[in-house]
């Protein structure tokens, strides 16, 4: 069984789901990073094309966007990929030229790099990176990628045992700077070891060099970082504690539909649920991964109860090509994350059309907005056909069969995301409908009674400290229907630029400048004080707020974005807001 082409310690999920470590040695040295694919093996008698399922209605429902009338394929949209290694590129790598004719190449990145320069021919190649890329840009007729015409820029960063966070940062920065900084999103399907972080007593507090770097790159170059979630026995959580992008977990099929969290995701310490109540009880057998003698929830999650896992996507039983274009079954969050990247490429292709036609401004390309769009349109509970659950296509389950309604996020104003489910599973079609609804502006200071927003829409705007922005629905919202609303904004990170060149260089560092305190309220349109709110999302540890709640009575409502003092950095805060309701 081939695990990964890199000399590494890899996590393997065998057919009965147990994890074991395999240590591989090459050239007398070890690499301590773990690729986030849990398994891969050659498929001999496939019964279905799992990638096609994961991209179609059984998964994220992106195929409909590739067909008329939309015809979205990611054309002319730049997206990035950073990993230890990279896919092959025809005319760069002899192995690619030898094995394939150009018309048979399934995965062809637009450009390939090594850290902050050109790729080294025939070096730093592996199957894992090719399989991640295939989810996005596969040209196979049956197993077509989500955005086959997107321009993928892929960079490898690791060549020696000591290569790690600084080198990965160089690669991310270099990718983001390409083509006048028009790379819309970057995929990170790898993790760095927390145990090797050089900080004293390192924590998942967002302050690892690579995590700071990823957030700085996002804010500085207007790109959305998407990170594969931690899994297996863990140990590789950096940069899953990022703020300005988000982390993706993976789902498995239930009766042919991707809709349940795979147990391979590392969220809580695994345990045997003897009484089948979906929670750990004293005395139940568990895996003590952190060796503290007690069961731990969120064992390798960000500190202070913060949840960076925002979305789920299919990642189990996918059939993806190797460097030799042989298809293998693979599982893991590594392959869930690029489902999000591919969807982003489709959205940006649509945005390009709208901008070129003069219908939208370039603000529609803001990464905060795309983040809000994706999260707000996720599937939670299947709609029954009356639109009261906003047309959601699937009920998403945690590993114990519980839904989002059963989570602490549903009942707490302080917790925007479920620890196990995030905001739900990616739905590319719903994300498109959310985006297509277009920008709608808040009530103007000149006319505070203006009721102007539709049931579905978005905005990207600025709010000043100690001020607020009101979004008043033009029509009454229907009782017992749900409303979903998501607010996102960036934390600020400063580059400690020793040589003043405006770029991160090896030996330099970053400083966390924190994030301002924004809150999101659902109110009746006539009410003026937030104490009168119907519901709110007021997390104190997140730069994201998310509301999903039933409308109590048919009435006029509004959303209010509030910037509370004291300011953490700038007195003006850019944000992205998306909403979906039934009127």
Regions found by a protein language model. Name each.
Residues 366-367, 371, 471, 502-513, ...:
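C-terminal edge strands of extracellular/lumenal beta-sandwich accessory domains
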Residues 392-516, 574-583:
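Secreted peptidase-domain scaffold signal
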Residues 157, 313-405:
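Hydrolase catalytic cores
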Residues 121-133, 206, 326-342:
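Gly/Ser-rich catalytic serine loop of serine hydrolases
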Residues 51-55, 64-167, 180-185, 195-198, ...:
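Subtilisin-like serine protease catalytic core
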Residues 31-41:
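Bacterial N-terminal signal peptides
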Residues 263-298, 508, 518-521, 536-539, ...:
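Calcium-binding acidic motifs and repeat modules
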Residues 83, 239-349:
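Extracellular S/T/G-rich loop segment that most often corresponds to the catalytic His/Ser-adjacent loop
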């Amino acid at each position: 069984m081939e695990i990964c082409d890199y000399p590494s310690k890899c996590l393997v999920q065998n057919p009965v789901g147990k994890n074991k470590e395999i240590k591989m040695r090459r050239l007398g040295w070890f690499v301590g990073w773990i690729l986030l694919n849990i398994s891969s093996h050659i498929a001999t008698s496939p019964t279905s094309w799992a990638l096609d399922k994961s991209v179609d209605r059984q998964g994220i429902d992106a195929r409909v966007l590739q067909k008329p009338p939309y015809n979205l394929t990611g054309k002319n949209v730049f997206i990035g990929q950073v990993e230890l290694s990279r896919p092959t590129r025809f005319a760069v790598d002899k192995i690619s030229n030898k094995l394939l004719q150009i018309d048979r190449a399934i995965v062809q990145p637009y450009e390939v790099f090594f850290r902050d320069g050109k790729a080294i021919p025939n070096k730093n190649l592996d199957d894992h990176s090719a399989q991640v890329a295939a989810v996005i840009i596969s040209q196979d007729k049956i197993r077509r990628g989500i955005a086959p015409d997107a321009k993928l820029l892929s960079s490898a960063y690791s060549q020696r045992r000591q290569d790690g966070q600084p080198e990965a940062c160089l690669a991310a920065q270099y990718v983001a700077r390409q083509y006048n900084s028009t790379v819309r999103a970057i995929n990170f399907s790898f993790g760095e070891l927390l145990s090797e972080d050089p900080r004293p007593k390192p924590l998942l507090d967002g302050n690892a060099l690579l995590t700071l770097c990823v957030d700085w790159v996002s804010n500085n170059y207007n790109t959305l970082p998407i990170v594969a979630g931690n899994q297996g026995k863990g140990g590789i959580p950096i940069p899953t504690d990022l703020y300005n992008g988000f982390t993706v977990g993976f789902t498995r099929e239930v009766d042919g539909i991707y809709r349940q969290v795979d147990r391979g995701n590392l969220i809580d310490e695994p345990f045997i649920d003897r009484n089948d109540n979906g929670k750990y009880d004293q005395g139940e057998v568990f895996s003590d991964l952190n060796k503290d003698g007690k069961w731990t929830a969120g064992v390798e999650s960000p500190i202070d109860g913060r949840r960076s896992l925002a979305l789920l996507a299919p990642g189990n039983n996918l059939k993806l090509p190797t460097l030799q274009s042989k298809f293998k079954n693979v599982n893991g969050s590594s392959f869930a994350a690029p489902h999000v990247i591919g969807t982003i490429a489709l959205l940006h292709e649509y945005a390009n059309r709208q901008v070129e036609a003069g219908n939208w401004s370039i603000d529609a390309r803001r990464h905060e907005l795309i983040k809000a769009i994706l999260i707000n349109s996720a599937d939670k509970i299947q709609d029954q056909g009356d639109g009261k659950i906003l047309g959601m296509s699937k009920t998403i389950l945690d590993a114990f069969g519980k839904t989002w309604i059963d989570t602490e996020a549903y009942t707490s104003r302080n917790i925007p995301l479920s620890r196990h489910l995030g905001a739900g599973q990616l739905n590319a079609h719903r994300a498109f409908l959310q985006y297509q609804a277009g920008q709608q502006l808040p009530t103007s200071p000149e006319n505070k009674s203006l009721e102007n927003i539709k049931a579905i829409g978005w905005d990207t705007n600025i709010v000043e400290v100690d001020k607020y922005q009101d979004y008043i629905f033009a029509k009454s919202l229907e009782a017992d229907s749900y409303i979903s609303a998501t607010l996102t904004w960036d934390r600020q990170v400063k580059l400690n630029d020793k040589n003043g060149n405006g770029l991160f260089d090896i030996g330099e560092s970053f400083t966390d400048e924190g994030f301002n305190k924004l809150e999101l309220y659902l109110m009746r349109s006539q009410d003026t004080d937030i104490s009168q709110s119907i519901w709110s999302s007021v997390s104190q540890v997140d730069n994201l707020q998310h509301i999903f709640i039933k409308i109590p009575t048919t009435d006029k409502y509004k959303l209010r974005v509030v910037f509370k003092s004291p300011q953490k950095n700038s007195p003006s805060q850019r944000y992205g807001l998306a909403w979906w309701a039934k009127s």
